[in-house]
Each structure stands twice: as C-alpha cells, then as structure tokens.
Amino acid sequence: MSKIFKISFLLFLIFSFTTFKSLSITDALIGTVGNKPLLHSDLINEMKMLLILSGKNFSQENKKELQKVALKSITGRLIKEIEIEKYKFNNFNQNDVDYEINKITEKLNIDLGTLKGSFKTNDINFSTLENRIKTELKWNGLMFNLYKNRVIVN
C-alpha cells in the first residue's frame, strides 16, 4: 500500500465519526481506483448506506469492520464502473432496478417511503442507491455478454 494512501486512511480514521453533521473538514481525496477518485464523503456515505441496508446501527465495536467493508464495496464498484465505461455498456432494465429496491424494502420489512426517509435522515441522496443497483445490473449484463459464448451448460 502506498504511503500516501496509508497516511490518508489514518487521517480519515482519526477524524471519522466525531460527528457526521458538524465535522468542519471539507471533502478529501482518500485515493483513486484507476481514474476514479475515492473521496472521504464517498466512504462515509457508503458506511451509512451499508448500515441502512443491513438494518444495523453504528457502534464503535463495528466501526473498523464497517470501514473495511465500505472501502472494499466502493473499490469493487469503481472497478466495475471503469469496465462498464470501457466497453460502453449501458443496458439495464428500470423494472429490474425497481425490483431490487422492492427486495430491499421487503428484507428490511419497511415501505419505500420509510427507506427514502432513512436515506434523507442520513443525508444520502436516494439516487445513490439506484445508481449502485444500476451499476450491478450493467455489470451483470456486461459479464453475460462477454462470456455467454464461453459457458457450456449440460
């Protein structure tokens, strides 16, 4: 791991979670994945979204694990976005996005309004979740298109 990334990540850990709303530090670049920036706000929002989607609350005990999972999640998604852009693949079905959101609400046993309210309460734009789902759908479609002729089903 590069020294800059280690220092940036250490600074992030020091300043994280004192408070989400009153933290007076402006957004900072944590690192990059390819040509895509990874910002402090992206990591915080990913952690919040993971907590919302898992139905869990933040605690100091799960902080480090949550940060690791969030960083891995963002990194994977950025890699997928790079490949999607590389192959100029933008096919997805909006009905599939709606279906995935419905699965989330059913899993959490809440309605769509409550889910959107949770995002608003945590200062996360709901379109972030929609874009995350779209990226997964595009990625799955891209992988299918690239490898459909190589798969043999008996």
Question: Where do the protein language model's features map onto the residues?
Answer:
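Short, low-structural-confidence N-terminal segments
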Residues: 1-72, 121, 144
